Amino acid sequence: VKESWVRPASLRGLFALPLMVAITLGMASVGAAHVLAQGVPSAAAGPPGTGLAWGNNSDGELGDGTNNGSSTPIAVDLPAGTTITAIAAGTAYGLALTSAGTVLAWGDNSAGQLGDGTTTDSSTPVTVDLPAGTTITAVAAGDRHSLALTSTGTMLAWGENFIGQLGDGTTTRRSTPVAVDLPAGTTVTAVAAGDRHSLALTSADTVLAWGDNSAGQLGDGTTTDRDTPVAVDLPAGTTITTVAAGAYHSLAVTSADTMLAWGYNIFGQLGDGTTTDRDTPVAVDLPAGTTITTVSGGARHTLAVTSADTMLAWGHNNFGQLGDGTTTDKSTPVAVNLPTGTTITTASAGAFHSLAVTSTGTMLAWGYNALGQVGDGTTATRRRTPVAVDLPTGTTITAAAAGNRHSLAIAPSTSTTTLQVTPPNPEPDQPVTFTATVTCTGSTPTGTVTFHDGTATLDTEPLSGNPTAILRVTRLTPGTHSIHARYNGDSNCPSSTSNPTTVTVPKPTIPVTGTSLPTILTAGSLLTLTGAALILAHRRRPAHGA
């Protein structure tokens, strides 16, 4: 708490008097971040925020504490004060990476995929039992197995492992994380989980794969399952920048802006113009001049966002999941029929439905919807073209992940600050205190609030535990002041600025000093003072002619 002199620009140099004011800060949110697309199910990353979920909830995969499904987004019941930066949707469960580098999980836990040491389902998020001192930077969710990338470039895995999808050299199911048996000296930079296989992108821009290989989805030229990572047989000279996994197929984007795919292809999900399975990577038949920025693999279809912010889709289309207005399978990419003027920033492919986030923070969805996973408030069997997800009023989305029959999203945190003015209409001789109380969705705000009078900065005060910031002003001058306050934000809660509040301080009556005269001028004392002045002047007038 500090005290300071404050005067309006129009009255600099005049009387300085105290003031108190109340202001409400407007809502603000952090900007969109790039989504790291993963397989079916999928994962996505964005700035810190809260979780939303919709669709089927029979296993608690919406994380709201119930088993009731919802055809519109509802809040995931995160622990108090928790914000999340990435989400992943498994077949019937969810993962969330927190701002603190820990992992939360909820939903189906039949194979230990929640990583809490049990096989008990949970309809609210539980903490994954990570090794002490571990910080996680990315997560991915498969059918019933989970992957995590650590800050040191190693990998952890847990859940189902009957086909070696955990990569620890065994086929033993794990209910807590174990280390993936990476080749010596390997640093992993990104992870992706398919139905029963796993992918890792390394710092050498190569790709490792392990687990189920029945359709060649490991890309090593065989159909032999692997319980430890093997190298994907990439074309010579290829550098990979992004990986994604479908249920039984795998995807990669190269530094040359081409795209590779391998594995199961009966519905054309590899996009090479055939329906032939591939046990080594083949080129996706992209339209000429197309550059891919984000990819995502569904159960039997694939989505891609282009550098022109449009979308392509190919593969299975029985429920309209390609979004082209038909239910015809496509073995080469076709354009998603987006609303006019829409710009897509991220996409996620579920089992039989698709999600997309727009540049304005809205969401589109299409495909299978019998359980409300499209999120438009209906359970229409299918949507062949994109429709708007019915988000809560004022909500923006920065990341989305599509599961089997449910959907997840991150809504970035917003902050609001209320300022109380006491007294609300200050007199010239009254002190004024600005008390700013800050609230933030998903977390407890920390940091500072800066108080402003027009373009002038009054002072910056720290938030206390309430959390409030207080500034006392003892020299606010008469006149009109335009007061606003700005919460400066922290790593989990964004900044926000109030609308200006006009505060007018009246001019004081003119004080007069002296032993026998009034201290405040009134009409009567003004006459008295005037008469006294005239008498004094008369007495001091020199004699005529002197």
Task: Give the label of every model feature segment.
Residues 412-546:
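Solvent-exposed beta-strand/loop surfaces, strongest in extracytoplasmic domains of secreted
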Residues 2-412:
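Eukaryote-biased RCC1-like beta-propeller repeat architecture
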